């Protein structure tokens, strides 16, 4: 519901990623279910399975004007985000080097951690690596109750934010 509320609040908010606009699916954990029907294909749309392309395009789109916010389903699982690291570094460098003057207002959502019996490639925690990049916020709700406020703050902030969603919170 937080994603929908933020899209209603700011008409310059876009969300895109893998399986975002596939009917009633709403990505792997149904977080964006029904959003394309409400906000249209101009604001909620699919991306190819190419994590570097997803993040790089979000970075470029967010530069068009300061009010634009882009929420990215960066990879269906954090484990698959590694190909996007070069583009993430570009987001962080631009923000850091310009002291915030060039702010890619991008929130990258990643499902992180275990608890689904997914094995090696569906259960990794990558936040230790992500926190080493200057100019990027890395946040993760500890409890389901924290998720809405933290996501809202991430989406309204200037500069790039990685929002890591613990899989254990999805059904809490």
Regions found by a protein language model. Name each.
Residues 1-171:
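Thiamine diphosphate
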């Amino acid at each position: 519901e937080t994603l929908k509320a933020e899209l209603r609040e700011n008409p310059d908010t876009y969300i895109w990623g893998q399986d975002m606009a596939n009917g009633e699916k709403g990505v792997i954990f149904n977080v964006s279910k029904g959003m394309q029907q409400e906000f249209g294909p101009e604001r909620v749309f699919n991306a190819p399975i190419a994590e570097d392309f997803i993040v790089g395009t979000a970075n470029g789109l967010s530069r068009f004007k300061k009010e634009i916010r882009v929420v990215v389903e960066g990879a269906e699982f954090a484990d698959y985000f590694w190909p996007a690291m070069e583009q993430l570094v570009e987001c962080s460098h631009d923000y850091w080097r310009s002291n915030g003057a060039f702010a890619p207002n991008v929130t990258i959502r990643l499902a992180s951690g275990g608890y689904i019996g997914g094995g090696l490639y569906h259960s990794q925690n990558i936040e230790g690596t992500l926190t080493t990049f200057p100019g990027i916020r890395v946040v993760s709700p500890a409890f389901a109750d924290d998720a809405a406020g933290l996501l809202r703050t991430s989406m309204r902030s200037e500069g790039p934010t990685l929002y890591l969603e613990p899989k254990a919170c999805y059904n809490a």
